[in-house]
Amino acid sequence: KYILFYLLFCLSVGGWAKDFVHPGILHSSEALRRIAGLVKNDVNPSMGSFNKLKAEPEASYHYCIQGPFRFISRSGEYGYTKSPCEDDFNAAYYNAIMWNITKDRRHADKAMEIIRNYAATLEKIFPMDAPLCAGLQGFILVNAAEMMRYTYVEEHNENGWTYKDTKQTEAMFRNVFLPILSEFYKTKPYTNGNWGIAVTKAQIGISVFLNDTKLYDDALDFFYHGKDNGTLPNYVAETGQIQESGRDQAHCMLGIGCLAEIAEVAWNQGDDLYGALDNRIMKGCEYLSKSNLGYDVPFHVWKDLTGKYSNWQSLGQAGMGEFRAVFELPYNHYVERKKMEMPYTKMVLNRIRPEGAGFTCDNPGFGTLLFYLGKDGERERKGRINENLKENLFGWQFAAASLKLKDDKMMLMSSGISCKKKGIMYDAGSYPYIAIKISHLPKNHNKNWFALSYNVMSAPEFWVFGESDAQIMDGNIYVFSIHGAKSNNGTEFSKRLTNVTLLMDFGETGGEGLDVEWIRSVTDLEF
């Protein structure tokens, strides 16, 4: 009975100590192996995100640390540290990811350099906006530290993670970041919800790094029950409307992205926050996607806990349709893991894939690599054009046109519509025809709307095609023969693999929408 008494005493005082999984904040060991496998196997569309990651200066092992700083802040006396500190923390995180993908120790050493310098130097986070600084920047840094602590150990690497690193880094998070987070939890609500969510994602991440069950439980308790706009029930309504939906869209994307990150950390630790309140995060993501695609969504004037943010009468238009890199994580959980449906988020991803960098330190970004759980996509055949504008607009540039919903279709809407895509590898010798399906063509438009361009003797030349040059199939597929076509300088179009720019210029359309479905190069007219 003494053993039973002892167990009950421990439970009543501190609860059961959690057996934490490591690495286990955003990326478990299994996830890191999966990410490396996506790159090794050249999986599409994940390689698009990887190529974007590699191109970031902060992902290079040549990155020059701009700190470390003793004091950091987002504004005020030490506001000058915001951007360089964010860059440094992103560099630690990106290089930790790159190390786990490439096994190039130079990436590992760069991440270690940044972590060690800040752990030995950083003393305090100053107002204003200290909770955001501690929450957003702290989460990125603790993810980097978690990965390096468990994947670059001293036993196997000369410059690997040491006992001293553990003590110094743990002390930094306990003494610099946690006091800000804890104070926010104790304070009466005074902010929009993204603050509390940012604080919670740092708290749950740091709790894992510190193996601190109480900190972890406090984060989950706040997520469900906190008296703040930044809890799940207070930030996302049953309809999916977000507390900041009437404010603007950037903060909504920040908030939903952070909620998904909190849920992913908990998932790696064996707790399902994704399913909380009947999959409330999914509902918020779908509402956010649907409204930003231009569809009608229900909206009610929100009564927030502070009383300061209860006067937004309609959806905030600032940032509408400007999608951040936060959609892959929730989509891959609900659709790929749980086999549920997120049709509007899928439409968003069809437009923005592959995801690139997050906004500053707000979210990690590169979700098409870091969180992709889908199948390997179709490989493009060398020299073949296959542009599906209904599913992917990556690389397309639009002049004076934007996608808007009309007649339940996403159309290009403007008084003048033109677009182009550079860097398309096209082999006209193998694919002598280009077919373009247009399901809605404005009554008034430029008749010579299709063109190809590439450099001849270092100068651009243009091959322009009119509607009269096309064979029209099935009423709305325009097929152009490229063989023998002459440029503005009389040059015959090359039959070799060529780097071309594809252009469409429909001119003044009187505001009528244009709906281009796809563009394909084909071998013959039987397709």
What are the roles of these predicted feature ranges?
Residues 1-6:
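Sec-dependent signal peptide recognition
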Residues 16-189, 243, 265-268, 273-381:
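Extracellular glycan-targeting catalytic surfaces
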Residues 167-199, 206, 210-213, 222-230:
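Extended amphipathic alpha-helical interaction segments
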Residues 207-301:
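Long, repeat-rich segments with strong aromatic
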Residues 378-401, 527:
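Extracellular carbohydrate-recognition regions
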Residues 397-417:
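Short carbohydrate-recognition loop motifs
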Residues 410-491, 496, 505-521, 525-526:
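Extracellular ligand-binding interfaces
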